[in-house]
């Protein structure tokens, strides 16, 4: 197969592992930055064309047809990356995670709405319009409070407000810069730990527990969190699979937290990193992803 990965940083561990796995299984993979693409729509065939410009001095060239596309772009490239994905979808190419599912996952508030609508348990959450005064929301959420920007990643844009007045001050400051935030219950009984599940289709292929270090409430590995193996019950695995389906994703990293009221889904990531979960679980997730693409690209082509 001829595969394409959409990624701004081809040297990242996840990108390199996927390229190695594809090569090992006899496939060719290109890695291209979606921000170097330009898209053409035409009434006459071919209706969907994608051109690529390597640099400011080079002449754009028409991209060939691919058997499958793997989106691995970050939050700053969401708009263009999803536009490129939509173009490939228009061409009938199999995309591992659709453009709409990617957009669902990248909007934290929309994803919470989709999760709860599908019956997936999530923390109590609030999102308010720009004309709502921050102090008016405080009686409706517990304290301490978690504050999150709508499209952050790797723990960036996540703040713990210990007291109600702190939450008000932080929200008012962010409002001045036109940055919207959602409020969420802080699950104190979980301490500084959460769980990352790697879901592929109808299966949880790997899990790990992440533990924040040195008083850091965020357990993200990018924030220095430690990881260790963890075993989930069948019920907990089903919640992770259900969350992935609710967002519309084929492959996802689902973040879970154990509360006194049961398991809660914190977030569903459309482009989860492979490094720490592969090293912690000992599972070759990159190879599993290529296997999944082989099967589903074949089904898509029939």
Curated annotation (Swiss-Prot):
Positions bound to ATP: 148, 185-186, 194, 218-220
Residues annotated as binding Mg(2+) 2: 267, 269
Q: Where are the transmembrane segments?
A: none
Q: What's an example GO BP annotation here?
A: translation
Name the UniProt key words of this record, in alphabetical order: ATP-binding, Ligase, Magnesium, Manganese, Metal-binding, Nucleotide-binding, Protein biosynthesis
Task: Please list the residues that bind Mg(2+) 1.
Answer: 255, 267
Sites where the protein binds Mn(2+) 1: 255, 267
The main enzyme category here is ligase
Asked if the Swiss-Prot or TrEMBL record annotates the protein with the keyword Transcription regulation, the reply is: no
Similarity remark: Belongs to the RimK family.
State the name under which the record lists this protein. Answer: Probable alpha-L-glutamate ligase
Organism phylogeny: Bacteria, Pseudomonadati, Pseudomonadota, Gammaproteobacteria, Pasteurellales
């Amino acid at each position: 197969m001829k595969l394409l990965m959409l990624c701004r940083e081809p040297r990242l561990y996840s990108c390199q592992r996927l390229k190695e796995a594809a090569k090992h299984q006899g496939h060719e993979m290109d890695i291209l930055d979606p921000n170097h693409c330009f898209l053409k729509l035409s009434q006459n065939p071919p209706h969907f064309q994608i051109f690529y410009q390597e640099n400011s001095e080079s002449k754009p060239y028409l991209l060939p047809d691919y058997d499958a596309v793997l989106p691995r772009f970050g939050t700053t490239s969401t708009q263009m990356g999803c536009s490129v994905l939509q173009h490939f979808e228009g061409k009938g190419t199999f995309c591992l995670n659709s453009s709409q599912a990617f957009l669902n996952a990248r909007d934290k508030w929309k994803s919470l709405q989709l999760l709860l609508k599908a019956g997936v348990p999530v923390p109590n959450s609030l999102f308010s319009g720009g004309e709502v005064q921050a102090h008016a929301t405080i009686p409706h959420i517990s304290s301490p409070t978690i504050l999150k920007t709508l499209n952050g990643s790797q723990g960036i844009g996540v703040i713990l407000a210990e007291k109600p007045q702190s939450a008000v001050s932080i929200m008012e400051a962010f409002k001045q810069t036109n940055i919207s935030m959602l409020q969420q219950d802080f699950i104190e009984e979980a301490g500084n730990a959460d769980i990352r599940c790697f879901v592929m289709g109808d299966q949880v292929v790997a899990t790990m527990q992440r533990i924040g270090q040195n008083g850091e409430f965020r357990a993200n590995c990018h924030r220095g969190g430690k990881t260790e193996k963890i075993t989930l019950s069948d019920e907990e695995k089903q919640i992770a699979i259900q969350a992935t389906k609710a967002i519309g994703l084929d492959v996802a990293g689902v973040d879970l937290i154990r509360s006194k009221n049961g398991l809660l889904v914190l977030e569903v990531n459309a482009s989860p990193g492979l490094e720490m979960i592969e090293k912690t679980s000992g599972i070759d997730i990159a190879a599993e992803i290529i296997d999944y693409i082989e099967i589903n690209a074949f089904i898509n082509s029939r």
